[in-house]
Amino acid sequence: MSTSSHKHNTPQMAAITLLGLLLVASSIDIAGAQSIGVCYGMLGNNLPNHWEVIQLYKSRNIGRLRLYDPNHGALQALKGSNIEVMLGLPNSDVKHIASGMEHARWWVQKNVKDFWPDVKIKYIAVGNEISPVTGTSYLTSFLTPAMVNIYKAIGEAGLGNNIKVSTSVDMTLIGNSYPPSQGSFRNDARWFTDPIVGFLRDTRAPLLVNIYPYFSYSGNPGQISLPYSLFTAPNVVVQDGSRQYRNLFDAMLDSVYAALERSGGASVGIVVSESGWPSAGAFGATYDNAATYLRNLIQHAKEGSPRKPGPIETYIFAMFDENNKNPELEKHFGLFSPNKQPKYNINFGVSGGVWDSSVETNATASLVSEM
């Protein structure tokens, strides 16, 4: 917000002022929210090519990107973009990487070192939502060995000070989440989670966590209110000692922090590797709910949770609606339609453009900052 006392009473400046006010009123404001990234999924048959996608990230000033596998077309397009990348090692490769260092070295050479430093890889996410209580249980015994091998290979490549190795988990691993201070990993999964926590603690890497208040709400609307899920509850919903919770996102996040502490990982940070809200396809999945959740999530990421105040590095799921995903609601998480038209009104950063879901505009966030 400009502190200048100068007044410019020309018609042109009046029009600019009016435009800026309208943009401030209508946009999901991410000005200064450097902790926000967006996940780039590719499960659609009508998506833009990689170069167009990365140009879209750049033109919207989206400075962080999650990539679910080392797609070389996307990595080529990312060269020189200055976008920070969370690079996924897919579940299908975990067992192979765990089986020997030679495989980890090859993977790091082909997918990391060959693109470094032109591509700013920040994290390697080894596996996504591998868990002993889901359909990925067959991979659980291979996950930590795969993480260790990739970590060693990254170190051998001379990138140990630049790239952190972790894994992305979901909330199925949390056995107790209420109240948040009593959060703990499932007793029947501790054999799986404890080695992961120890690895992250020892390597000073964060745990990557996919947090979706939508699924908690839609699965139990009688107990979890929509306002609590959308960051719009007018009053405190959960009083946990001295900590007050007005939204489900914070409660979920802090329950994982508590679980980490109970597992010897008090020093382990958290990156929210996915969060979003579908705009169609199931109960509670509406355009208005999705817009409200995204607006408030983006704002809240600047602030932190009751347990851990401060910016929360958060990746919105996802960049596009992806028509090859199932079930139906999974097709409707995108910030953009496949034709690159925005679904919502969002402003990514002080140097990026404000964009409108009905009409594209060349107005910049610096213009808005003059109001």
Swiss-Prot record:
Localisation per UniProt entry: Vacuole
Signal sequence coordinates: 1-33
Keyword match Manganese: no
Family annotation (Pfam families): Glyco_hydro_17 (PF00332)
Residues bearing carbohydrate: N362
Propeptide residues according to the Swiss-Prot or TrEMBL record: 350-371
GO CC, one annotated term: vacuole
Modification sites for Pyrrolidone carboxylic acid: Q34
InterPro entries referenced in this protein's UniProt entry, alphabetically: Glyco_hydro_17, Glyco_hydro_17_plant, Glycoside_hydrolase_SF
Tissues in which the protein is found: Is expressed primarily in epidermal cell of healthy plant, and following induction by ethylene, accumulates in mesophyll cells.
Active-site residue numbers: E129 (proton donor), E274 (nucleophile)
GO MF entries: glucan endo-1,3-beta-D-glucosidase activity
EC numbers, comma separated: 3.2.1.39
Reaction it catalyzes: Hydrolysis of (1->3)-beta-D-glucosidic linkages in (1->3)-beta-D-glucans
Induction: By ethylene.
One of the GO biological process terms: carbohydrate metabolic process
Alphabetical UniProt keywords: Glycoprotein, Glycosidase, Hydrolase, Plant defense, Pyrrolidone carboxylic acid, Signal, Vacuole
Keyword Nucleus on entry: no
Annotated PROSITE patterns: GLYCOSYL_HYDROL_F17
Family from the record: Belongs to the glycosyl hydrolase 17 family.
Role description: Implicated in the defense of plants against pathogens.
Name the UniProt record assigns to this protein: Glucan endo-1,3-beta-glucosidase, basic vacuolar isoform
Organism whose genome encodes this protein: Nicotiana tabacum (Common tobacco)
